[in-house]
From Swiss-Prot:
This is RNA polymerase sigma factor SigA. The lineage of its organism: Bacteria, Bacillati, Bacillota, Bacilli, Lactobacillales. Sigma factors are initiation factors that promote the attachment of RNA polymerase to specific initiation sites and are then released. This sigma factor is the primary sigma factor during exponential growth. It comes from Enterococcus faecalis (strain ATCC 700802 / V583). GO terms for biological process: DNA-templated transcription initiation. Belongs to the sigma-70 factor family. RpoD/SigA subfamily. GO terms for molecular function: DNA binding; sigma factor activity. Residues 303-356 are annotated as: Sigma-70 factor domain-4. Residues 60-86 are annotated as: Disordered. One of its GO terms (cellular component) is cytoplasm.
């Protein structure tokens, strides 16, 4: 591909991804018609294009919304490997007796042959509910194997299994044996979709779109790999070079990836303190300021007591000394049943008295 054509192609791919990200899926034929055919991509280039689209969090599906033939071919090996895995709990995950019993129980169920899957699929087409149940039960271990890979992303192991089982039931409903793939290959796609979407919806306090969750996970994988290779934390520039992303975009993703921390998080060996206890309240007054304020209130009360009751009350209302709400001359006049001019005179007289050295010296220290 010539340099000029290559630039146009990259721009077209970026625009295609931007347009389809909100949907989260794209039909394989649309991908081929809009990008593969105009730029005459060979099989290898098409493979790279699909990988780039899927890395952006967009699933490539057929016209019915099912996994495309390309996706199914990719999942064949993964499905075989997952079926062969043991049903032990993931490393570092504690499981209780009911979960242990569940894993033991599904481990007893025999795997189906390709011929048995076709036989059950034909019965399911006729509405046989028992066939649905048998096909699902024979693949429950597949759900557990796939769920293990998503442990540590914000959801409990049992919740991951539950979401995966929902995806499995969807696969049972939509399985088409005529495509020539084993059911486990078909189910792997649906199980993975169900789990990743559940993680995006439920694992975080602030919801992040599925495509961004997958981008974050990819960034974290690359970050860890670079940490091992370099022996230090990689810079956003180094991560961006590895992911083929601008540095500013990497910084934005890292910011989005930050997890909220609860103020109730226990601190200390005995968990007798919480994180919130150590967060400074920027609006709170210091003990010294609070003590000075209380002393000022006391001194002000003493000074106001030297005025007549009417003078004291006029000043309290005019300056909001009791409730923090100042009043106009007219409002105070209504309270006392006099004109605003009379209130102005009373206020002026009271303030003159307060300015007298015998009274003002008690408050001057608080102005320094």
């Amino acid at each position: 591909m010539e340099k000029e054509t290559s630039k146009k192609y990259e721009a077209a791919v970026a625009a295609f991804i931007k347009e389809n990200k909100p949907k989260g899926t794209v039909v394989y034929d649309d991908l081929a018609n809009q990008l593969a055919t105009p730029y005459t991509l060979d099989a290898e280039a098409m493979e790279k294009l699909i990988q780039k689209v899927e890395d952006a969090g967009i699933s490539v599906v057929d016209e019915n919304g099912d996994p495309s033939e390309h996706s199914l071919k990719k999942d064949e090996k993964e499905a075989e490997k997952a079926q062969a895995e043991d049903l032990s709990a993931p490393t570092g995950v504690k499981i209780n007796d009911p979960v242990r019993m569940y894993l033991k129980e599904i481990g007893r169920v025999q795997l189906l042959t390709a011929a048995e899957e076709v036989e059950l699929a034909l019965k399911i087409e006729e509405g046989d509910q028992e066939a649905k149940q048998r096909l699902a039960e024979a693949n429950l271990r597949l759900v557990v194997s796939i769920a293990k890979r998503y442990v540590g992303r914000g959801m409990q192991f049992l919740d991951l299994i539950q979401e995966g089982n929902m995806g499995l039931m969807k696969a049972v409903e939509k399985f088409d044996y005529r495509k020539g793939f084993k059911f486990s290959t078909y189910a792997t796609w649906w199980i993975r979709q169900a789990i990743t979407r559940a993680i995006a919806d439920q694992a975080r306090t602030i919801r992040i779109p599925v495509h961004m969750v997958e981008t974050i996970n990819k960034l974290i994988r690359i970050q860890r790999q670079l940490l091992q290779d370099l022996g230090r934390e990689p810079t956003p520039e180094e991560i961006g070079a590895e992911m083929d992303l601008p540095t500013e975009k990497v910084r934005e993703i890292l910011k989005i990836a930050q997890e909220p921390v609860s103020l109730e998080t226990p601190i200390g060996e005995e968990d007798d303190s919480h994180l919130g206890d150590f967060i400074e309240d920027q609006d709170a007054t210091s003990p010294a300021e609070h003590a000075a304020y209380e002393l000022l209130k006391e001194q002000l009360e003493d000074v106001l007591d030297t005025l007549t009751d009417r003078e004291e009350n006029v000043l309290r209302l005019r300056f909001g000394l009791d409730d923090g709400r100042t009043r106009t001359l007219e409002e105070v006049g209504k309270v006392f049943g006099v004109t605003r001019e009379r209130i102005r005179q009373i206020e002026a007289k009271a303030l003159r008295k307060l300015r007298h050295p015998s009274r003002s010296k008690q408050l001057k220290d608080f102005l320094e």
